[in-house]
Amino acid sequence: MNFVVIIPVRFFSTRFPGKALADIHGKPMIVRVMEKALDSGADKVIVATDSVRIAQVVSSERSSGEVYLTRSDHQSGIERLGEVAANYKFPDNQIIVHLQGDEPLISPIMIRQVANTLDSVKSTTGMATLATSLHSLEEACDNNVVKVVINMNNNALYFSRSMIPWNRGYFDNHPDSRPSRILLRHIGIYSYQVNFLYHYIKWTESPLEKLEQLEQLRVLWHGETIYVSVIDNVFNISVDTPESLRRVNMLFGND
């Protein structure tokens, strides 16, 4: 199964400017993420950025990873993916994995899994993602942790920063309980077929997406489906603050 990984990244992150080049145990974070993608077995790995500085860092690596300088007027990572896909002239059925540039601990197995998932359901949907069970009420109540509700066919019903679904009356009476397996944490990695990607970037921004600040809600708003593969034993930390960077460096140091 053939798939391509694209890592959209910009230098001026709102919460943590310059984090793409933050040092993680001797290497810039974007390089660490690219290495994970290369280990996934992808046919091609492309870093998509509007930053010359980031492009130079990636280009200096002696690896098979590529870099593509995008326009600077994109409003989102998905728009960068669209520009890259069009420039490379990928076929309509090509599977693209959208990997965030702040995921240096992501497992290469997960990267391949989200591609395999879409390959298995591509006749019914153009987009797939991953989720895992929530492990604590603290995690379930954290608005930085995105939750997802799925139906019996594993299609997403809704994504939210709030705890969904809410078990009426139970959590109030059992505050120390573990969430049930039906409560899922979304893992922010996606796979798309190229023709679906082109539709996605043409859709207008939805009210729900603006409210939650979750771009994937645009797909549900426009009546399309997102297939969600539920996986176990996931450990991952996104680097979005200096504190999370320190935690990741400690984990790399313990390898």
What are these regions, as identified by a protein language model?
Residues 52-116:
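Short phosphate-binding loop-to-helix
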Residues 107-204:
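Conserved core of the sugar-phosphate nucleotidyltransferase
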Residues 49-50, 106, 192, 240:
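A conserved hydrophobic position in a structured secondary element of the catalytic/binding core
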Residues 173-255:
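Conserved alpha/beta core of the MobA/IspD/sugar-nucleotide pyrophosphorylase nucleotidyltransferase superfamily
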Residues 5, 45-47, 96, 127-128, ...:
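Hydrophobic/aromatic residues located in beta-strands of well-ordered beta-sheets
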Residues 11, 71-77, 233-235:
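Short, acidic/turn-prone active-site loops that include or flank metal/cofactor-
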